[in-house]
Amino acid sequence: MRLTQGCFSFLPDLTDEQIEKQVACAMSRGLAMNVEWTDDPHPRNNYWELWGLPLFDIKDPATVMFELNEARKSCAAGYIRMNAFDASYGTESCVMSFITNRPVSEPGFYLDRTEGVGRQIVYSIKSYSVQANPEGSRY
């Protein structure tokens, strides 16, 4: 099952050239880039691990691509995404995010049903990879 989070998630994976163009476009608008990774693909997992430091003062897309490639070397078996951060007054938030790296196999999710008090049924989504493997060895 293909994880769909962020921009371009329903399109085929972006090539490095396309990623670099997106980074250049974001930087031309004054956005700061950063790289994040995770091995927990749950849809509500918004807090991925930050790779290195945020690239606030970087003006060259090649530097961002270098950091992305370094993250790919270390975290090749997990998910890696790029974020564009708008630090302008009134926004101060992530305005663009897209996945740049995926594991070879994405086993997907299952629906867990639990009965509570008064026949209340609670559903939760759980990842097959998280259930089967401890953190750090999921992919």
UniProtKB/Swiss-Prot annotation:
<keyword id="KW-0113">Calvin cycle</keyword>
<dbReference type="InterPro" id="IPR036385">
    <property type="entry name" value="RuBisCO_ssu_sf"/>
</dbReference>
<dbReference type="GO" id="GO:0019253">
    <property type="term" value="P:reductive pentose-phosphate cycle"/>
</dbReference>
<keyword id="KW-0934">Plastid</keyword>
<protein>
    <recommendedName>
        <fullName>Ribulose bisphosphate carboxylase small subunit</fullName>
    </recommendedName>
</protein>
<dbReference type="InterPro" id="IPR000894">
    <property type="entry name" value="RuBisCO_ssu_dom"/>
</dbReference>
<comment type="function">
    <text>RuBisCO catalyzes two reactions: the carboxylation of D-ribulose 1,5-bisphosphate, the primary event in carbon dioxide fixation, as well as the oxidative fragmentation of the pentose substrate in the photorespiration process. Both reactions occur simultaneously and in competition at the same active site. Although the small subunit is not catalytic it is essential for maximal activity.</text>
</comment>
<comment type="similarity">
    <text>Belongs to the RuBisCO small chain family.</text>
</comment>
<dbReference type="Pfam" id="PF00101">
    <property type="entry name" value="RuBisCO_small"/>
</dbReference>
<dbReference type="InterPro" id="IPR024681">
    <property type="entry name" value="RuBisCO_ssu"/>
</dbReference>
<keyword id="KW-0150">Chloroplast</keyword>
<dbReference type="GO" id="GO:0016984">
    <property type="term" value="F:ribulose-bisphosphate carboxylase activity"/>
</dbReference>
<dbReference type="GO" id="GO:0009507">
    <property type="term" value="C:chloroplast"/>
</dbReference>
<keyword id="KW-0602">Photosynthesis</keyword>
<keyword id="KW-0120">Carbon dioxide fixation</keyword>
<comment type="subunit">
    <text>Heterohexadecamer of 8 large and 8 small subunits.</text>
</comment>
<keyword id="KW-0601">Photorespiration</keyword>
